[in-house]
Amino acid sequence: MALQTGEPRTLAEKIWDDHIVVSGGGCAPDLIYIDLHLVHEVTSPQAFDGLRLAGRRVRRPELTLATEDHNVPTVDIDQPIADPVSRTQVETLRRNCAEFGIRLHSMGDIEQGIVHVVGPQLGLTQPGMTIVCGDSHTSTHGAFGALAMGIGTSEVEHVLATQTLPLRPFKTMAVNVDGRLPDGVSAKDIILALIAKIGTGGGQGHVIEYRGSAIESLSMEGRMTICNMSIEAGARAGMVAPDETTYAFLRGRPHAPTGAQWDTALVYWQRLRTDVGAVFDTEVYLDAASLSPFVTWGTNPGQGVPLAAAVPDPQLMTDDAERQAAEKALAYMDLRPGTAMRDIAVDAVFVGSCTNGRIEDLRVVAEVLRGRKVADGVRMLIVPGSMRVRAQAEAEGLGEIFTDAGAQWRQAGCSMCLGMNPDQLASGERCAATSNRNFEGRQGAGGRTHLVSPAVAAATAVRGTLSSPADLN
């Protein structure tokens, strides 16, 4: 990334330059000011302990927001948390936030939910910001034209104490997606196809800017889905330049600017675009019209194929490391090469997570489930990304559609995205999930995960095998 030189700059470079407190001059890290710090119960306890031991306070508590998400149950939330480790982490977060004066949205609060859903819904996430959280999927917030990234626990402490972070400039990547998306193809299919194309290390060391007519046509929810999974491509962050879609989403939200402050903010936001002539370190191109519903078959997000394809044969792979990884993945997933993806039966379907737990995602699922039933032998969990999302879904009658279909309509939380709460797979169970990671044991020890879009998840629940809504007609 380039410092201010008068040369054309990318969006990421502009935001970076606007937040340099002290320049490292290319020899040392730059000290970057942080506009918004998001906190949850898993990665923050040691950071607060560090502050306490050093006798420090939180530098800017008003720029810090905490919520309970990873460990919380999604049923019986009025009861004590059963797991002692989860209970301790949640209780510790509550004590730390009370002691250090940090806003916290706890279970039962209408604004409680997954931190990467809560920030945008409150209007805290805004264009041009630097945003960090002790969570890799902080890249979600880049959908608003923010530079947002996950950080480690020691960095969480540094931001709490100073509201700054020492960082070395990143490389920049442009992912250009042009053309019209076919019917039934979503943002989730775009990002899964991209990761399959460039690999889980393809974006390493980069900030990705998603560009092109297909990206511009997406809703904010769709853009958040894509930016959310930038980390699965190895990138440090992902972002989309703000536009009228962004401004319309933010207008009127609780923490969005109003009146003259809105007008001032809008002037700045409208400048947040990559300059003509700016040079990216890497450029990637996808043809939107060529995309189709996508699904993973292996144990990393890059091991995916179109739903219409079959499980690949490792023996046809020319790269030794790729072949060995595929063989190991197929053994864990209990799949045979050549099996049609549509013939793979599932035991469970999970709709939710910071990737696909927003109201637009739930509307897509409801449209597929309306008048249909979840297949016998399939357990379907639908978990809203926040209590605010749940309330909106209830107001629109979506909850009734879910329960009428035989799905479990839960309270807000990270849920079955990861095995840190009661919502887990049993060993050997197979799940179609709208979440972001399909690692071994991610959804519970021995569980097998296929990453899919909300539409594919809903159709899969109805048919009992990996399917798209078109397969139901």
UniProtKB/Swiss-Prot annotation:
| Reactions the enzyme catalyzes | (2R,3S)-3-isopropylmalate = (2S)-2-isopropylmalate
The UniProt entry's GO biological process terms, in alphabetical order, are: L-leucine biosynthetic process
Q: Which Pfam families match?
A: Aconitase
Q: In which pathway does it act?
A: Amino-acid biosynthesis; L-leucine biosynthesis; L-leucine from 3-methyl-2-oxobutanoate: step 2/4
Give the Enzyme Commission number.
4.2.1.33
| A Gene Ontology term for the protein's cellular component | peptidoglycan-based cell wall
Identify the residues that bind [4Fe-4S] cluster.
C354, C414, C417
Keyword annotations of the record: 4Fe-4S, Amino-acid biosynthesis, Branched-chain amino acid biosynthesis, Iron, Iron-sulfur, Leucine biosynthesis, Lyase, Metal-binding
SUPFAM superfamilies reported in the protein's UniProt record: Aconitase iron-sulfur domain (SSF53732)
Q: Extract the GO molecular function terms from the UniProt entry.
A: 3-isopropylmalate dehydratase activity; 4 iron, 4 sulfur cluster binding; metal ion binding
How the cofactor binds, per note?
Binds 1 [4Fe-4S] cluster per subunit.
Required cofactors, per record?
[4Fe-4S] cluster
Q: Does the keyword Lyase apply?
A: yes
Record keyword 4Fe-4S present: yes
Gene3D superfamilies found in the cross-reference section: Aconitase, domain 3 (3.30.499.10)
Q: Which domain of life does the UniProt lineage start with?
A: Bacteria
Q: What does this protein do?
A: Catalyzes the isomerization between 2-isopropylmalate and 3-isopropylmalate, via the formation of 2-isopropylmaleate.
Assembly, in brief, is: Heterodimer of LeuC and LeuD.
Q: Which family does it belong to?
A: Belongs to the aconitase/IPM isomerase family. LeuC type 1 subfamily.
- Stated name of the protein: 3-isopropylmalate dehydratase large subunit
Source species: Mycobacterium tuberculosis (strain ATCC 25618 / H37Rv)
